[in-house]
Every structure is written in structure tokens, then in C-alpha cells.
Amino acid sequence: MQAKKRYFILLSAGSCLALLFYFGGLQFRASRSHSRREEHSGRNGLHHPSPDHFWPRFPDALRPFVPWDQLENEDSSVHISPRQKRDANSSIYKGKKCRMESCFDFTLCKKNGFKVYVYPQQKGEKIAESYQNILAAIEGSRFYTSDPSQACLFVLSLDTLDRDQLSPQYVHNLRSKVQSLHLWNNGRNHLIFNLYSGTWPDYTEDVGFDIGQAMLAKASISTENFRPNFDVSIPLFSKDHPRTGGERGFLKFNTIPPLRKYMLVFKGKRYLTGIGSDTRNALYHVHNGEDVVLLTTCKHGKDWQKHKDSRCDRDNTEYEKYDYREMLHNATFCLVPRGRRLGSFRFLEALQAACVPVMLSNGWELPFSEVINWNQAAVIGDERLLLQIPSTIRSIHQDKILALRQQTQFLWEAYFSSVEKIVLTTLEIIQDRIFKHISRNSLIWNKHPGGLFVLPQYSSYLGDFPYYYANLGLKPPSKFTAVIHAVTPLVSQSQPVLKLLVAAAKSQYCAQIIVLWNCDKPLPAKHRWPATAVPVIVIEGESKVMSSRFLPYDNIITDAVLSLDEDTVLSTTEVDFAFTVWQSFPERIVGYPARSHFWDNSKERWGYTSKWTNDYSMVLTGAAIYHKYYHYLYSHYLPASLKNMVDQLANCEDILMNFLVSAVTKLPPIKVTQKKQYKETMMGQTSRASRWADPDHFAQRQSCMNTFASWFGYMPLIHSQMRLDPVLFKDQVSILRKKYRDIERL
């Protein structure tokens, strides 16, 4: 027994020695071989770095701040061929590790704010219409500056949208043209727009020139190549996409249950070979010809017949039987499979048609995914699970379908209906990254009215906006500030402006009164103003222009504003009733004088009317209540050209405010009571208030309507037939039972 133990110990020791010798010998030979190579390299003037050499070394204090991709390129540039260098320089992925923190200079923005500079167009350079629309949207925005020294962001005038070498829109020698720009600075603080990249057969995401440290606003970008918090994914849109405005969504009313004729539809090309063909070639497995109609055609391209298969003739025949628009408007879900590239025109078409998109494009970074929650508006599928799509969408509850459909309409109208909205959304996302302390949150981006109309510079608290009271569980304000616009001198104690001031001050909801003195005469003495129970603040306008009545004055301490012309005739009861109505509709204009617009077929232009009809689309701000945020929006969102027009004409400011509020809310204003005459008829004809009797005044308002509609790109005003009266208004009951009894006698 002892002998066996000794033999076992001896055998184990021998095995250990053998293993030690084997591995030790290998390491020794490897080190000797390595030393011989170093010696041989030294004789031939070559140097092979040790593995430690590939780790970045920082010879000075600033070296650690060099982007990592630049370090890697510097360390390995010696060991790649010239062709590999060219490929690397022209690749989209060179700055793949760029982020705002490493490849963007924030100091330019903190100094002058978020301003965007567009390079002047170079002589002889052709620009496609789509790119012209992008540049026009930037130049027409509040972010634009013509001074590069004031700019925070730079946009090329060179057309970078189509980088498919087979396209007639392809711009040659773009690399040298970009490098010659004196402000290029390796792309730092630059934004490059791109819709198409790569070409047949693999359609890579290479844009064909070195973008350096520039950001990409790119369509069909993959999650693999998307640089989070740096690039912006934009939708693929056609050359016919409107520059401004755009059509509204096609959902006119909600149907319960929210099911349509077809459950799932698709009509498009079937790629017989190459990238993107796998999914579309398999769609026939899901098509049932009843409520799931997925149609493809082989008829596209020059040589489709060379590659046609046994199904092509049957597919082409069935493809012609269905009208695409009819399918789109009568389907609950629309399939959006990838094409040659990840993005597809079908995406925006489905959104507009209120057809819930079913995404089948693995690896696609969805448009504006940084701020939009697409799970609220689309079904994200998987190309590998195509056969499970029908059963998946059938299992979605009707309540969820209705919510998805409504969200498609909101997103379409807020961010995608025009090139301008796509561009402005891109810029707002970048601005939020720069000024994170006042950036918009997810609720703002994904709830009405959307991120473009909610300016965080106004406030970082959602309760200061009129759109989120229900979300926050808040009640609308309980007090208002009356702002009286005075343009005539105070010569008599019986003037309408003094009567109006007293009537407003007696309201139980009035917190203060501000008189905006836009008269050429000096301010009257304090004793000329009547004594009231609330503070009266008189502000003398510096410029004395019409737009000054909508400036966001710090003196306005309440969220509600009662806007009044000096010759308005209102009683305290009318003021109280209008305010209580506004508390139920804090995002709208609520008031008394109603006007309407119409389309004049003979003149092919918009018309303005003050006739008493069965509907209206405007409530004039001479006697109306609205949220004070609209003062800020009027001053900071609208372009200077429209405000200058208003000031030059001394007219149309009330129309412009109605345009703005309707564009934001997508809702009409609200008229209260049947009162039609709200102006004092005994005003002196020599006063500025007599402009209402001027025939040119009405003609100017007609012209304003069309100018405003042109800037918005569509007519935002919406007709309404609703009028709100007090309960028991003119009912045959005792007057003592009525709360607003004085209104019936007015």
C-alpha cells in the first residue's frame, strides 16, 4: 500500500515537471524569437511596437482630451496601406465615437445663444429642391443668423442629401469642396443633412467624404452607426414633401370600435435579389386576400424580367387590382418593411393616413427617437418573426388601437407634415442637448401641442403652460390681469377707457390692471385715473407699436390675461362670465367679438368678414381672455417680418394672435354670449380708434389674412358654431335664480 502511494507521488511530480518544462520552453522560445525579430528589424530600419504600444500614451496634459478615434487612427496609421487610409477617411464611421462632450464646442452657443449659420451658395453649384427647402426653413427660422461669428451651428450650402453615386443629384468632388471651407474646422459644430447614402448593391451608409466631427441628420440610419446624443435620425421624405404647413392628418373623427375594412395592408416593390429582398419576398406567406392584403410587384428596374420568378406574374396581376390610397385610408395597420435602405416613404404615408405603422426594419434608428416614444404610435416588429405579425396585431386591444391612431395624427402634424417641421425639430433637439438645464422632457415632446410650440426658455415648470393642467392635476388660475391698450389722450372723465377700467376692477377675479399707454401724448397725472380696489399700473410703450400689446411684460403676475381695447364696452358681469368660461378652456382664446374667414373662389385668396353668420373662426383680442404664454410665443416664435407688417399697418395684430393660437391648439376660439356690439360708438372721429371706420382698414385685414396664411403654409383658423351662454340664459324662470342676470339686459 505504501509502495503504491510512493509511485503515485513520483508520477505526479514527474508530470508537473514535464508540464513546467513544456510551457516554460514555449515562452522562452517565444521571447527569443521576439528578440530576434526586434534585432532583425533594427538592422533593416523597421520598428514593430510591443503590445503595450497600442495603449494610448499622453505626453502632455491636453492629450487625454483628444478623441479616442483620433488616437487610434494616429497609432495605427503607419500600418495600413494608402488605399485603406482613403477608405477610412471617406467612411461615415471615422468619428463613430463622437459625442456632444467630445466633438462639439459649447462655448460658441453659450456666448451668443443657439444661432445657425448657412454658408452662402457657391457659384455654379446646383442644389436639389429638397435641400433648398431645408436651407429655406433654416433661414426663415428664429435660429438663423447671417453672421458666422454669432453662430453656434453651421450648415453647408453644398447639397449633401443624395450621396448615391448613381443618382443624377450626386455632387462630385464634395470632399475637396468641404475641406476648402474656411470655417469647416474638421466639421466641428457642423450639421450635415443626408437622405440617401451608399449605392448598389450593398447600400452602405457611407456619405462619400470625411465628415470629421460633424453631426449627421440622416435618414435610414442604423442603430449600429447612430451616435447617441450626437446624430439625429430624420424620416425619409420625397421631393414633393411640402416646405411649410403641409396637409393635416386624414383622421377626421374617431370610430368606435376603431377597426377598418382591412386589418393589415402593404403595396410596394418586391426586390427579387440583393439587400432588402428577404422580407418582401416572404410577404406572400402572410397575405390572405381578405383582411391582410400585402401586395408586391416585380415590375421595377430595367432588368426585372431577367430575375423574375414563378410568382411574379401572379403577384403583378393581383397588385393591379387594388388602389393604394383606398387601402391606406381603410386599413387599421400598415406594414412598413425595409427597402434597399432601412427607411421607407411608407412610414410618413402611414402616419398621415392614421394607419398604425407596423415596423419591419431591424436595426433602424427611428426618426427623432431621442425624443419621440414610438411605442405610443407604432408597432415595432421583427423581420425574423414575420409570420407572427398577424396574430400579434389581432391581439391588440381596441382601446390601444385608438390611442395609437390618435398619436399618429399628433406626431404627423407636430413634427413630420412639412420639411420645415422636420428641420425645426432637428434643431430643437440639438438645442436641448446644449442647454440641458432648460431642455424639454418626454411629456412635452409626446403630448399636444408638442416640442416646437412649447419653448423651455419661458419656464422649466410645466404648470406655467396652459396645456398640462390635467396631466399635473392642477386647476387653472383663479385670477386675471386686465391689459388695456390705450391710444388716445385722456381728456374727459367720461371717456370709455375709464368706465372700462372701473368695470374690470370690480370683477372678483381681477388681480391687477395694466394700462399700456401707446398714445403720442404724455402720460396723464395719477389723480386722473379712478380709484380702484386693485392696483393700476400704467406702462408707457417705448416704440408705441401695435405688437407691443403682446409683449411678455414682467408686470403681468397672473397666467390669465384679459386683453381690452380702450373703447371696449363690457360690464363686470360679462368679464366674470368670460373668465369662468376660460377656466374650462385655458389653452384657447375666449371672448366676445367674433369674426370669420372664407375662401374667395373668384379671387383665389382668403377673405375676412365681420358679418354675423352662423359660424366664426376668430375672437378679436379687443375683448378676450387668454393665457399669458401666448405673449411670449407671439414675441419669440413669430418672425420679425410679420410683426413688422403689423406695426407698419397699425392693424391685424388680433388676427395674427388668432392664427398663432389656432396653429398651436388645432382648435377654434370660443365666443361667449350673443353680444355683437362691443365698441363704444361715440368715440371721437379724430382719434386713432376711428381706424375701424376707415375703409382701408378692412382692406388691410384682407391682405393680412393671406400674408399670414402664406407664412404658416396653410390656414390654421378653424370654424366653430359653438357659443357659450350662462345656464338659464333667457329661460322663463325667475331672474333671481340666474347667476349672470345682468347679461340678459345688455
UniProtKB/Swiss-Prot annotation:
Its localization reads:
Golgi apparatus membrane; Golgi apparatus, cis-Golgi network membrane; Endoplasmic reticulum membrane
| Gene3D superfamilies, sorted | Spore Coat Polysaccharide Biosynthesis Protein SpsA, Chain A (3.90.550.10)
Q: What EC number(s) is this enzyme filed under? A: 2.4.1.225
Reply yes or no: does the keyword Manganese apply. yes
The organism's superkingdom is given as: Eukaryota
* Chain residues that bind UDP: 267, 269, 271, 280, 319, 324, 346, 349
What biological processes does GO assign it?
heparan sulfate proteoglycan biosynthetic process; protein glycosylation
Query: Pathway involvement?
Result: Protein modification; protein glycosylation
All ranges on the Lumenal side of the membrane: 29-746
GO molecular function, a single term: metal ion binding
A Pfam family it matches: Exostosin_GT47
**Chief site of localization:** Golgi
Which stretches are Cytoplasmic in the membrane topology? 1-7
Kindly list the positions annotated as binding a protein: 166, 203, 300
> Which InterPro entries has this protein been placed in?
Exostosin, Exostosin_GT47, GT64_dom, Nucleotide-diphossugar_trans
PTM per Swiss-Prot/TrEMBL: N-glycosylated.
Q: Name one GO cellular component term.
A: Golgi apparatus
Q: What does this protein do?
A: Glycosyltransferase forming with EXT2 the heterodimeric heparan sulfate polymerase which catalyzes the elongation of the heparan sulfate glycan backbone. Glycan backbone extension consists in the alternating transfer of (1->4)-beta-D-GlcA and (1->4)-alpha-D-GlcNAc residues from their respective UDP-sugar donors.
Oligomeric and partner information: Part of the heparan sulfate polymerase, a dimeric complex composed of EXT1 and EXT2. Could also form homooligomeric complexes. Interacts with NDST1.
Q: What family name appears in the similarity comment?
A: Belongs to the glycosyltransferase 47 family.
Indicate what this protein is called per its UniProt record.
Answer: Exostosin-1
- What is the species listed in this Swiss-Prot or TrEMBL entry? Papio anubis
